[in-house]
Amino acid sequence: MAKDVHVVERVEVPEGVTVSIDGMRVKVSGPKGEVERDFSHARGVLIRLEDNSVVVESFFAKARQRALVGAIAGHIRNMIKGVQGGFRYKLKIMYSHFPINVKVEGDKFIISNFLGEKGLRIARIMPGVKVQVKGSDVIVEGIDVEKVAQTAANIELATKVKDKDRRKFMDGIYIYEREVIA
């Protein structure tokens, strides 16, 4: 198995964003808020601040450490994008016969009358994520890309059609757009 002597990736920190590193815990603060993440599971990888950039590196890295260096650098880039502008997922409410009713109550997204069902379907909204319903669109926004994406996935999965032909029963709430808010 070949080893690389030194694998390094630099992530530039833009103006108005501050990054603090405590061991393997990275905290990124910006105009939209603050995101914190723990990378202590990444063995053999070092994270440090140098000038105006975050350096993610590994010495004598095998394939796993090389992959971790790139993944951690990508997570830090997403954290910086989030505190600068945020992330937005748009979902569309689709139905053919029974109109789907949705509402937001606290940390729950409640779906009623899905395929004419009397029971409610509930999707969990992750902390720090804002959900709005505008007509047949559901807009999910936040600064942590993973929480925003997980909330959108929870909403989409709550309307999964079971025991029916998906080609015929296309009712549901579907993600149709993802964007970084500038």
Curated annotation (Swiss-Prot):
Q: Choose one Gene Ontology CC annotation of this protein and give it.
A: cytosolic large ribosomal subunit
Query: Mind telling me which InterPro entries this protein's record contains?
Result: Ribosomal_uL6-like, Ribosomal_uL6-like_a/b-dom_sf, Ribosomal_uL6_a/b-dom, Ribosomal_uL6_arc, Ribosomal_uL6_CS2
Report the domain of life of the source organism.
Answer: Archaea
Which Pfam family is one of this chain's hits? Ribosomal_L6
The UniProt entry's sequence similarity note says: Belongs to the universal ribosomal protein uL6 family.
Native organism: Aeropyrum pernix (strain ATCC 700893 / DSM 11879 / JCM 9820 / NBRC 100138 / K1)
This chain's protein is named Large ribosomal subunit protein uL6
What GO biological process terms does the UniProt entry carry, in alphabetical order?
cytoplasmic translation
Query: Tell me, how does this one assemble?
Result: Part of the 50S ribosomal subunit.
| UniProt function note | This protein binds to the 23S rRNA, and is important in its secondary structure. It is located near the subunit interface in the base of the L7/L12 stalk, and near the tRNA binding site of the peptidyltransferase center.
The UniProt entry, under PROSITE patterns, shows: RIBOSOMAL_L6_2 (PS00700)
Q: Could you tell me which cysteines form disulfide bridges?
A: none
- UniProt entry keywords in alphabetical sequence: Ribonucleoprotein, Ribosomal protein, RNA-binding, rRNA-binding
**Record-level Gene Ontology MF annotations:** rRNA binding; structural constituent of ribosome
